[in-house]
């Protein structure tokens, strides 16, 4: 080393010590000498100046197709932009040559630190633009080699080169150019076979359904070349995918068969019990698994006692779900097998008898045997005049609606009129009913024509014989022919908010 170079190094070190110690005069002196000698220098702030604690950096990443995503990186303010590029390369696979960093609205250079760009606190932001690799010389082998070199540098191994495994190939002499041989150059190498990822431009193998780098789906228009032969690695991957698909289909089939068997077993049960803790919406009892009943039609859950009480107190052949709140009344019905499983044999028989009685009373073509306390009845047709009761075996006349086995119809009618003239009690009863009908204190049922009257309360009543719901104020049926809820007929009370009559006192 000559004297001039040695002197320049001493003056540079003296300048560094003077700046560090805050000696302005000495720093000016040394800097002036170095400037006069035109000594080339590189001035760089030591890492100790920047904070060393880790911070969270918010990075907005955008590619050539204007796709944007936000990621968070754990960095130190004293890191250089080059180190930041290496971090992104190792973590996300984007080579440093494709990264353009913008920090504080300024293009960052590799040797600059994050601290110099104002990155000092958690939540500070930066912008990363990813260049397209379409026009670069990157290929999968070069990309893998760069990643391995970066990993070796992180481990402290520098100035290394990666050698391929296996026996060394003999060094071939350099081929002569066409100027030396007088022949044209060989044809350029054919482009690699595969499809190019529209996101990161990586060339993937033809059979791969998604990008190996960014997992983006293969373009739908791409067709695998007919002459393409997969290599060993691809064949292994395809075999693994086929095996995974086979196992998936097998598990799916097993699950379907299990679900089917579960449904079959559930269908064979009369009652569906709850599998999770539930609360009865009627009595608010907390029910453990297996203590409540889930109705098949509407899936509402109740305790057994509340359902049994609902069935016993029902006046209809079809028992409605008892669920009701301020906004909703469930229209679901209990199934016959659910009712049979909930009730005792005696209660179930009474329920069946109620259904038969309702069916009889609501039919205009039904006739009940006139024998006292006899349960026999029938549906009659126009061409049938007599009914032999299967219970008491008495013969009923369907024309006279009576039993007169030793008289014909004319004789029975004459005898009935004669007895009515001499029966004072019958005459008084007939007169009382006529007066009540005239004064509006009683009315004929619009279905079965018996006399009904209202004791007190609202204007809704139910016929005790045919169970027809009646609107007292309009003297007609409450609902249409479809039954409860059918507003196509009946009094149509509260349809569009309009009462059925100015004097209506709520007919439900």
UniProtKB/Swiss-Prot annotation:
Q: Name one Pfam family in it.
A: zf-RING_UBOX
Record flagged with keyword Cell wall biogenesis/degradation: no
Disordered: region residues: 161-191
According to its UniProt entry, one GO biological process term is: T cell receptor signaling pathway
Q: How is it modified after translation?
A: Auto-ubiquitinated. Auto-ubiquitination leads to degradation by the proteasome.
| ZnF segments: RanBP2-type | 188-220
Write out the ranges of the annotated region (Interaction with IRF3): 1-218
Q: Which residues form a coiled coil?
A: 231-260
Q: Record's SMART domains?
A: RING (SM00184), ZnF_RBZ (SM00547)
Where does the signal peptide begin and end?
A: none
- This protein's superkingdom? Eukaryota
**Expressed in which tissues:** Widely expressed.
The entry's Zn(2+) 4-binding residues are 397, 400, 404, 409
Which sequence ranges does the entry mark as zinc finger (IBR-type)? 349-409
Region annotated Interaction with RNF31 sits at 69-131
Q: What is known of its domains?
A: The RanBP2-type zinc finger, also called Npl4 zinc finger (NZF), mediates binding to 'Met-1'-linked polyubiquitins. The UBL domain mediates association with RNF31 via interaction with its UBA domain.
What is the name attached to this protein's record?
Answer: RanBP-type and C3HC4-type zinc finger-containing protein 1
From what organism does this protein derive? Rattus norvegicus
Q: What is the lineage of its organism?
A: Eukaryota, Metazoa, Chordata, Craniata, Vertebrata
């Amino acid at each position: 080393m000559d004297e001039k170079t040695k002197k320049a190094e001493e003056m540079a070190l003296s300048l560094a010590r003077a700046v560090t110690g805050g000696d302005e005069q000495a720093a000016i002196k040394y800097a002036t000498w170095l400037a006069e000698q035109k000594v080339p220098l590189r001035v760089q702030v030591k890492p100790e100046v920047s904070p060393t604690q880790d911070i969270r950096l918010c990075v907005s990443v955008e590619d050539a197709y204007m796709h944007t995503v936000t990621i968070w990186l754990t960095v130190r303010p004293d890191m250089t932009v080059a180190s930041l590029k290496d971090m992104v390369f190792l973590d996300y696979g984007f080579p440093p040559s494709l990264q353009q960093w913008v920090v504080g609205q300024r293009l960052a250079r590799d040797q600059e630190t994050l601290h110099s760009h104002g990155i000092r606190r958690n939540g500070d932001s930066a912008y990363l633009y990813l260049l397209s690799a379409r026009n670069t010389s990157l290929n999968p082998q070069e990309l893998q080699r760069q990643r391995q070199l970066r990993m070796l540098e992180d481990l402290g191994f520098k100035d290394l080169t990666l050698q391929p495994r296996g026996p060394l190939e003999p060094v071939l002499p350099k081929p002569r150019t066409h100027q030396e041989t007088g022949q044209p150059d060989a044809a350029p190498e054919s482009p690699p076979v595969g499809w190019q990822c529209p996101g990161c431009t990586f060339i993937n193998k033809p059979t791969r359904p998604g990008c190996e780098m960014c997992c983006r789906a293969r373009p739908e228009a791409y067709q695998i070349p007919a002459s393409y032969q997969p290599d060993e690695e691809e064949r292994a991957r395809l075999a693994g995918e086929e095996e995974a698909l086979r196992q998936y289909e097998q598990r799916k089939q097993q699950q379907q068969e299990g679900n089917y068997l579960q449904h079959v077993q559930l269908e064979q049960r009369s009652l569906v019990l709850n599998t999770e803790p539930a609360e009865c919406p009627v009595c608010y009892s907390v029910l453990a698994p297996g203590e409540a009943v889930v109705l098949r039609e509407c899936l509402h859950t109740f305790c057994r006692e509340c359902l049994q009480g609902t069935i016993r107190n029902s006046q209809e052949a079809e028992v409605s779900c008892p669920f009701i709140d301020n906004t909703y009344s469930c229209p679901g019905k209990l199934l016959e097998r659910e009712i049979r499983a909930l009730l005792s044999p005696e209660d179930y028989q009474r329920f069946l008898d109620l259904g038969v009685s309702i069916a009889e009373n609501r039919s205009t073509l039904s006739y009940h045997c006139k024998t006292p306390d006899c349960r026999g009845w029938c549906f009659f047709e126009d061409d049938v005049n007599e009914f032999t009761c299967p219970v008491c075996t008495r013969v009923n006349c369907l024309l006279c609606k009576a039993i007169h086995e030793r008289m014909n119809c004319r004789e029975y009618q004459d005898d009935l009129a004669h007895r009515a003239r001499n029966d004072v009690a019958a005459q008084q009863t007939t007169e009382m009913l006529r007066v009540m009908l005239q004064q509006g204190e009683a009315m004929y049922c619009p279905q079965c024509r018996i006399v009904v009257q209202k004791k007190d309360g609202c204007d809704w009543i139910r016929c005790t014989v045919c169970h027809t719901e009646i609107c007292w104020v309009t003297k007609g049926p409450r609902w249409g022919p479809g039954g409860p809820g059918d507003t196509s007929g009946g009094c149509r009370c509260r349809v569009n908010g309009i009462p059925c009559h100015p004097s209506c006192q709520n007919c439900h």
